[in-house]
From Swiss-Prot:
The gene is kefF. Homodimer. Interacts with KefC. Its main location: membrane. It is found in: Cell inner membrane. This is Glutathione-regulated potassium-efflux system ancillary protein KefF.
Length: 176
């Protein structure tokens, strides 16, 4: 099963993430957990989140990039849900062997993240990749949708279909 942990502070303003979720939602065995919908008060139900994670073979962290990082509720979710003794540390093997995909949207163009005056995309992903590896997850190459503020609807739809194809390809290879 694919579990999408979706964190968008302003989902009603989203164009790209909305289309990505619509495409992903057409696949079988996909569960979408919208953190800002579930936890508007930031009071995360850790047991429910850990239960959802335990059912998944592929975990997707999907969100818009905010200040070169994750939205605040996703960071809190990581702090609360990925606990010692469950996700890492002595006895913390609940996530071992599962796959993790970072699916991120950005307002800037892909060249904005080239090494130079701004951090490279590989550099920006390091904290998430380190978290994944520390929890025994298998890090997959990220899916990024760039220039989302200026993309026309056809381009957004095409990129959202690419996202769906990425998830479908994972399902076909992993029978999940």
């Amino acid at each position: 099963m694919i579990l999408i942990i979706y964190a968008h502070p302003y989902p009603h303003h989203s164009h790209a993430n909305k289309r990505m979720l619509e495409q992903a939602g057409t696949l079988e065995n996909v569960e979408i957990r919208s953190l800002y919908h579930l936890y508007p008060d930031f009071n995360i139900d850790v047991a429910a989140e850990q239960e959802a994670l335990s059912r998944a073979s592929l975990i997707v962290w999907q969100h818009p990039m905010q200040w070169y990082s994750v939205p605040p509720l996703l960071k809190l979710w990581m702090d609360k849900v990925l606990t010692h003794g469950w996700a890492y540390g002595h006895g913390g093997t609940a996530l071992h062997g599962k796959h993790l995909l970072w699916a991120v949207t950005t307002g800037g163009g892909e060249n904005h993240f080239a090494i130079g005056s701004h951090p490279g995309f590989d550099v920006l992903s390091q904290p998430l990749q380190a978290t994944a590896l520390y929890c025994g997850l298998k890090w997959l190459s990220p899916f990024a949708m760039h220039c989302t503020f200026i993309c026309d609807d056809d381009t957004l739809q095409a990129q959202a279909r690419q996202y769906k194809q990425r998830l479908l390809a994972w399902q076909e290879v992993n029978h999940g």
